[in-house]
Amino acid sequence: MRRFRPLFLWLVIAFLALLYVVNSLYSALLEGLHLPLQTNDQVILESSRLAPLTTIVLLVLAVIVAPLCEEIFFRGFVFPGLRRGLATGWAIVVSALVFGLAHADLGSLPVLIVIGLLLALLRWWSGSIYPGLLLHILNNGISAAVILLYMVGRLH
């Protein structure tokens, strides 16, 4: 595993900013084209008041189990496998596309691809799935926190 460098923290911050920009632009495009694509988070939000306990269990799975399984599969197996036959840059891009498409969430596809790019870059740079796993848990945890705040009436 490589030693942590502050520059890398800035790269992560830049990617998170890019994530926000991509999400905003994609949302504006969908709205402008009047395409009624929902994200998985929106579906969970809509059902959260009807089945709160189910939603809480789903959120725990989304924050802990999903990132662990996805990082082991996509960055532990898919990415290294792609690197055997492709240049590293292409392996990063292809693994990010597969990661995005595997979520079956057209409403969030560009954002998921950017997340996949960041996580594959983290895997390549660090030589480990652990930094990406932590970032993945953080990302899903933020989404879960927003949904929980919505459920308790703090967000509308």
PLM region descriptions:
Residues 69-94, 124-128:
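Membrane-interface helix/loop boundary segments of multi-pass membrane proteins
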Residues 1-66, 84, 153-156:
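Juxtamembrane helix-loop-helix connectors linking adjacent transmembrane helices
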Residues 89-156:
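Functionally important transmembrane alpha-helices
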Residues 23, 62, 75-79, 95, ...:
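Membrane-embedded glycan transfer/ligation machinery
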Residues 9-25, 29, 64, 68, ...:
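Hydrophobic, lipid-facing residues on alpha-helical transmembrane segments of integral membrane proteins
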Residues 66-71, 105-109:
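Short helix-coil transition sites and intra-membrane helix breaks within transmembrane domains
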